[in-house]
């Protein structure tokens, strides 16, 4: 694995950062602060890379507690780190170096043994983030929107300056993983997407937690259509196996979900 970061500058102080293991983080800069959205799997120094892009004081906001989104938090002990308290259990269990190394082993095999020294250590304490919390970065704000489903503590963030939505894993171009043991019932995810749509936010584009990025705002509608189709007929999906377990995969109108047919309704 090549331990390096890359970025795309989308203008207006928004940077998409690709980690060595390909997950996506985002840096959003105001006039007084910068917000780092997610810290990735914690391989290599994301902090050093971010400091090449901005010298503003940082805050870190995790879209949820999975290891490929909060695994690098240990580098940022000198700034506030926000994560929903509803994801603290999975953060504590899944963001240890040992758990993350095991995840990466599924990707690159025994090569992970050669890069163990590159894994960030430490699980710093986090501050809770609630629905509607506003992060003032100076002449721009990010507003937290809770979207429980993929995990109990998933959030999106709406940027009032560019009208982009930072979607984490809730709104990716690929499969939304709803088959995990700690994922909530599919109907909960559907309710989150319907609520998000009903907010009538003037979303221009969505920046997801995995490539490709960005995706179009109609991905919300596509995920809603897919979830409704599954709820109507839980057997429509085809079996899929991943490194994290197995589920059924359904795709409707370009929106796809990987789900557990036994976790459909509340």
Label every model-predicted segment.
Residues 3-52, 157-172:
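Conserved beta-strand hairpin/beta-sheet module of binuclear metal-dependent hydrolase folds
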Residues 28, 38, 50, 64, ...:
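Divalent metal-coordination and catalytic microenvironments
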Residues 36-39, 58-68, 81-85, 146-149, ...:
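Active-site neighborhood of phospho(di)ester-bond hydrolases with catalytic His/Asp-centered motifs
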Residues 43-135, 173, 224-237:
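Active-site HxH/HxHxD metal-binding segment of metal-dependent hydrolases
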Residues 131-159:
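Core dinuclear metal-dependent hydrolase active-site scaffold
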Residues 143, 172-182:
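Surface-exposed cleft-lining segments at the edges of enzyme active sites
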Residues 180-197:
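Active-site-adjacent loop/tail segments of enzyme domains
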Residues 194-266:
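Accessory terminal helices/loops
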């Amino acid at each position: 694995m090549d331990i390096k970061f890359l970025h795309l500058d989308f203008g207006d102080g928004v940077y998409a950062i690709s980690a060595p293991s390909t997950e996506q983080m985002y840096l959003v800069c105001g006039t007084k602060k910068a917000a780092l959205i997610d810290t990735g799997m914690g391989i290599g120094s994301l902090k050093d890379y971010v400091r090449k892009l901005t010298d503003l004081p940082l805050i870190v906001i995790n879209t949820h507690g999975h290891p490929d989104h909060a695994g690098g938090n240990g580098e940022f002990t000198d700034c506030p780190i926000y994560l929903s308290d509803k994801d603290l259990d999975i953060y504590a269990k899944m963001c240890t170096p040992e758990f993350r190394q095991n995840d990466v082993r599924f990707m690159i095999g025994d090569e992970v043994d050669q890069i163990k020294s590159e894994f960030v250590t430490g699980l710093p304490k986090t501050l809770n983030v609630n629905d509607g919390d506003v992060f003032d970065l100076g002449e721009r704000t990010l507003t937290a929107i809770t979207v429980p489903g993929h995990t109990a503590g998933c959030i999106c963030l709406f940027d009032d300056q560019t009208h982009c939505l930072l979607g984490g894993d809730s709104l990716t171009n690929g499969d939304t993983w709803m088959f995990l043991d700690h994922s909530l019932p599919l109907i909960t995810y559907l309710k989150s997407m319907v609520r998000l749509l009903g907010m009538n936010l003037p979303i221009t584009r969505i920046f997801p937690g995995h490539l490709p990025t960005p995706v179009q705002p109609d991905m919300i509608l596509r995920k809603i259509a897919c979830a409704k189709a599954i709820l109507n007929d839980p057997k429509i999906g085809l079996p899929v196996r991943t490194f994290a377990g197995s589920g059924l995969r359904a795709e409707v109108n370009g929106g796809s979900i990987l789900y557990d047919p036994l976790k459909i309704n509340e």
